[in-house]
From Swiss-Prot:
Designated name of the protein: Large ribosomal subunit protein uL16
Lineage summary: Bacteria, Pseudomonadati, Pseudomonadota, Gammaproteobacteria, Pseudomonadales
Family designation: Belongs to the universal ribosomal protein uL16 family.
Keyword hit for rRNA-binding: yes
One example GO MF annotation: tRNA binding
GO annotation terms (biological process): translation
InterPro entries: Ribosomal_uL16 (IPR047873), Ribosomal_uL16_bact-type (IPR000114), Ribosomal_uL16_CS (IPR020798), Ribosomal_uL16_dom (IPR016180), Ribosomal_uL16_sf (IPR036920)
Keywords carried by this UniProt record: Ribonucleoprotein, Ribosomal protein, RNA-binding, rRNA-binding, tRNA-binding
Length: 137
């Protein structure tokens, strides 16, 4: 699963996930893309699960790009532990997603197959998504 090899600090503050995606909102690599319409957090497991659904559906055809990376640690205290005594240990990693962010891209397959594959992948994600095509100016 995806997670940073090393970070400057082990734990991060929760923070806020406001605004729209300023970067990573255009289809850069592939022909078709899955774009987030809602805001939220994607865990490394969810990103991997959707990637597997994509690769299994397109089989050997096409190339897939993952445009998000889980770089934020989420901590959790063990069960039945009283409050206080410091922050919990890192439980999993998340990518914070703003509306407009491109999550996955694909090329080398037909539009129909890409739509089917992205529908399967979107079912694995906790966000509302949309299918977008690359626009060449």
């Amino acid at each position: 699963m995806l997670q940073p090899k090393r970070t400057k600090f082990r734990k991060q503050m929760t923070g806020h996930n406001r605004g729209l995606a300023l970067r990573g909102s255009k289809v850069s690599f592939g022909e078709f893309a899955l774009k987030a319409v809602a805001r939220g957090r994607l865990t490394a497991r969810q990103i991997e699960s959707a990637r597997r659904a994509l690769t299994r559906h397109v089989k050997r055809g096409g190339k897939i790009w993952i445009r998000v990376f889980p770089d934020k640690p989420v901590t959790k205290k063990p069960l039945e532990v009283r409050m206080g005594k410091g922050k919990g240990s890192v439980e999993y990693w998340v990518a914070q997603i703003q509306p407009g962010k491109v999550l996955y891209e694909i090329e080398g397959v037909s539009e129909e197959l890409a739509r089917e594959a992205f529908a399967l992948a979107a079912a694995k994600l906790p966000l509302a998504t949309s299918f977008v095509k690359r626009t060449v100016m």
